[in-house]
Amino acid sequence: MSSLSKDQFVSVILSTKTVAAIVKAATKVPRVSLVTTADRNILLVPLHGVEGEWKPVNDPQLEYYDTYPGFLSSRSGPKLSNDVLNKAQKDIAQGKPVPMDLTCHADSKTTDNLFAKIIRGELEQWRVWESESHVAFLTPFGNTYGKTVLVPRKHLDSDILSLPDRNFSELAGAVWDAIQQIVRSDLGAERVGLIFEGMEVDWAHAKLIPICADDGREPLEQPFMETYGGSVS
């Protein structure tokens, strides 16, 4: 997937919506997440145990990997220092100042959403990329160096695989653009993993996880979970 053009990438990601609908029906779950390490495979993970009405679900277990462990995980990590976040921001931006367009199109129901506040510049942040319609910033609780969150400037449902095709395609296009920024940066990432999950904040968002060369150790394995516990891998 890392070698796909923007149009090809959007087309492939868009096709997962149809499969996700089939998975939902077959497994009788209200939500399905997407995980890909940007190789040849895209995983669609049914979120067993999640209720139909959105409620936040957070995994209390924290983790951090200095090198790629052989899998992706959406778990949070311990709070990173500002020095680490500043360096990661500089690496991704290649030392150039990142524009800060604070335009946000939240409605009255979502104006106090965490992401709305970040987009408007009301909270400390480490923005690494933006366009007229989307913003990408480092998460201070990343489980790997340079972990990035991408959000639209307007509120969209956090169940990304159920978004209308137009909104979904625009988001996928922004993901591709942000991935190119990360891969071409000084971060040293060979490719960038992608996760659609949406159970921490009720605002559509993509998690972009830089995948750098491993250190040759045997890849770790994540345990099988029968119900969703706040993270996917």
Where are these regions (language model features)?
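HIT superfamily nucleotide-processing domains
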Residues: 1-233
